[in-house]
Amino acid sequence: MSTYFVGDLHGCFDELQKLLERVRFDPVKDKLYFTGDLIARGEKSLECLRFVKNLGTSAQTVLGNHDLHLLACAYGIKKVKTRDNLTALFAAPDFDELMDWLRQQPLLVHNDHFNFSLVHAGISPDWDMATAQACAREVEAVLRQGDYRALLRQMYDSRPERWSSDLQGIERLRYSINVFTRMRFCYADHRLDFDCKLPLEQAPSELMPWFACDNPLFKTENIIFGHWASLVDCPTPGNIYALDTGCAWGNRMTLLRWDDKRIFSQSAVKKTGVF
């Protein structure tokens, strides 16, 4: 049995299949995890969603910002962007079934046995693991059983910028969504910044990557995430695994075999997105 993690798919189905062939992935005995953003930009979002869904318990994804935006589009809250290449997905006969399945996916997977935490973008510098898990469960409960349409409608805001245990209602849910699916840079006081999308070496000096903030969790927890394609080839601490390497932008897709921490890469078949 092997455990694998794959960075953001963004509809790049062919590259995923090539990677899985290389490592001889066996859904009968292996487990495959995804960092979210299964869809958008690449040409085979429908195939990616169907594949992950049909793997059943052999696969697990977390929700990314593009996945949540897809849900907002599916329920008529937002309009689909042409550049996201989602025409085939929206026309699929199993579209509603796929959206129901996607809405059930978590924001955080924490595994004590294999000693890892999986998220799309990151974990708040103000959270310990118990708080991170609690905040993830709060959002997931609304998406799965609550007034998810209202949540999807109100999630498009970068406020609040800073965590407080006193946060309630939509502000608390929105902060959690932004941390788990959108965060990249933070200030020294742990305020979130959503304006800067530059590579680390070009970012303003007052900003730091979320995992460089002062939080004991970031020194002890193995955290696996995607989302940040411009981190490609940038060094991170040994327990921090950034797996989005920009396949949809013409770079490559990355797979991590957890058993021996070996990295496998597959070059993009073609560039389909705009970075």
Curated annotation (Swiss-Prot):
Say which domain of life the source belongs to.
Bacteria
A Pfam family the protein falls into: Metallophos
State its Enzyme Commission number(s): 3.6.1.41
Gene Ontology molecular function, alphabetical: bis(5'-nucleosyl)-tetraphosphatase (symmetrical) activity
Which reaction(s) does its UniProt entry say it catalyses? P(1),P(4)-bis(5'-adenosyl) tetraphosphate + H2O = 2 ADP + 2 H(+)
Entry keyword set = Hydrolase
**PANTHER family documented for this protein:** CYTOCHROME C5 (PTHR40942:SF4), PTHR40942
Similarity remark: Belongs to the Ap4A hydrolase family.
Q: What does this protein do?
A: Hydrolyzes diadenosine 5',5'''-P1,P4-tetraphosphate to yield ADP.
Question: What's the protein here called?
Answer: Bis(5'-nucleosyl)-tetraphosphatase, symmetrical
What is the species listed in this Swiss-Prot or TrEMBL entry? Actinobacillus succinogenes (strain ATCC 55618 / DSM 22257 / CCUG 43843 / 130Z)
